[in-house]
């Protein structure tokens, strides 16, 4: 294990040198690629360097045990350092787990109202605000790509791109069915209604990922409807693209420019097709392992938001928090961190069982 990390440490030092090279800095695509590799390695190398320091300090304190005057202090230090060594050992094992190649990617977020009619659409809007505020806290960029608004507020469907560092890594476990329990404003008897929305987090496709034959596309243009000012319904700016082999359909009318709408629709189309391919691969892997991939089942009911009790429960890991207001305001780091830790431990367990 440590031979591998030492090789990675040499690579890390090479990257630090390359990133200060003016030639590399001038080549922005290469600079971004190397910066991403450097950022991916940094946590492991930092943990490894702390681990080596702890080993050196343990050795020094072992030698101090022979000194009667220093023995008691050395024993305390050995106890503390042994715990730190154990913690770092576990941290390094997790950091050495195979990386999800999508973790550093931007994402396409899709939220769709499900059962519950107007209340479900309102909750779709609540979820979109929650993710938007979480994105703000992480300094990510959110761009609306497409939406279908409900008459009473919220969205029947909303699609957005989220760009920034580690977006997919933090949000990938949000895919699934989100259930809400609350009293609608129109409910005179005060009865609690249950409704649901589905969330899909898809790693954004890059041009190298998927090659789409233009002959496989059916492109329709039409006049946009809804918000958009004086240009609405005056030009055929809205675009609908159908990928004939898969039947995938994407429409976009958010921009006044047909060219921009077409580019946004293509971005979503490529991402959906790539996501379908990856979902099929994940399903096969899960079947081979005879276990369900936690981030893969979009039909899985993953979470309940109970407004009368101010409670959020994530059913996959049994996490319950009684601070629903702050969660809906985008404070979901505790949830995303707990999910990542859970699935990392599952991966470690699977790795040790397969060793």
From Swiss-Prot:
One of its GO terms (molecular function) is translation release factor activity, codon specific. Its main location: cytoplasm. The keyword Disulfide bond does not apply. SUPFAM superfamilies: Release factor. InterPro entries: PCRF, Pep_chain_release_fac_I, Pep_chain_release_fac_I_sf, Prokaryotic/Mito_RF, RF-1. Methylated by PrmC. Methylation increases the termination efficiency of RF1. It comes from the Bacteria. It is found in: Cytoplasm. Keywords: Cytoplasm, Methylation, Protein biosynthesis. Peptide chain release factor 1 directs the termination of translation in response to the peptide chain termination codons UAG and UAA. This is Peptide chain release factor 1. It comes from Trichlorobacter lovleyi (strain ATCC BAA-1151 / DSM 17278 / SZ).
């Amino acid at each position: 294990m440590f031979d591998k990390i030492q090789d990675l440490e040499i690579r890390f030092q090479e990257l630090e040198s390359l990133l200060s090279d003016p030639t590399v800095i001038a080549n922005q695509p290469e600079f971004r690629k190397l910066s991403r590799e450097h950022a991916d390695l940094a946590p492991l190398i930092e943990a490894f360097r702390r681990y080596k320091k702890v080993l050196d300090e343990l050795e020094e304190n072992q030698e101090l045990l022979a000194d009667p005057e220093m023995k008691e202090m050395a024993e305390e230090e050995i106890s503390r350092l042994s715990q730190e060594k154990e913690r770092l050992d576990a941290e390094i094992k997790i950091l050495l787990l195979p990386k999800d190649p999508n973790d550093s990617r931007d994402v396409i977020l899709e939220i769709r109202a499900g059962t519950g009619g107007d209340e479900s659409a309102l909750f779709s809007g609540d979820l979109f605000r929650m993710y938007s505020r979480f994105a703000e806290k992480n300094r990510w960029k959110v761009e609306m790509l497409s939406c279908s608004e409900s008459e009473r507020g919220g969205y029947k469907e909303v699609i957005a791109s989220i760009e920034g560092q580690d977006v997919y890594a933090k949000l990938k476990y949000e895919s699934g069915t989100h259930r809400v329990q609350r009293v609608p404003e129109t409910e005179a008897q005060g009865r609690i209604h249950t409704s649901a929305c589905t969330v899909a987090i898809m790693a954004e496709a890059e041009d190298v990922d998927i090659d789409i034959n233009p002959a496989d596309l059916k492109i329709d243009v039409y006049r946009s409807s809804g918000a958009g000012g004086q240009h609405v319904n005056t030009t055929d700016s809205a675009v609908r693209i159908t990928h004939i082999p898969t039947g995938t359909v994407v429409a976009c009318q958010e921009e006044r420019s047909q060219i921009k709408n077409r580019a946004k629709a293509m971005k979503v189309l490529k991402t959906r097709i790539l996501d379908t391919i990856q979902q099929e691969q994940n399903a096969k892997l899960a079947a081979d392992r005879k276990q369900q991939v936690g981030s893969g089942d979009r039909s899985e009911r993953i979470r309940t938001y109970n407004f009368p009790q101010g409670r959020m429960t994530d059913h996959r890991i049994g996490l319950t928090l009684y601070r629903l207001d702050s969660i809906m305001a985008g404070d979901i780091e505790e949830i995303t961190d707990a999910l990542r830790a859970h699935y990392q431990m599952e991966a470690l367990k699977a790795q040790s069982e397969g060793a």
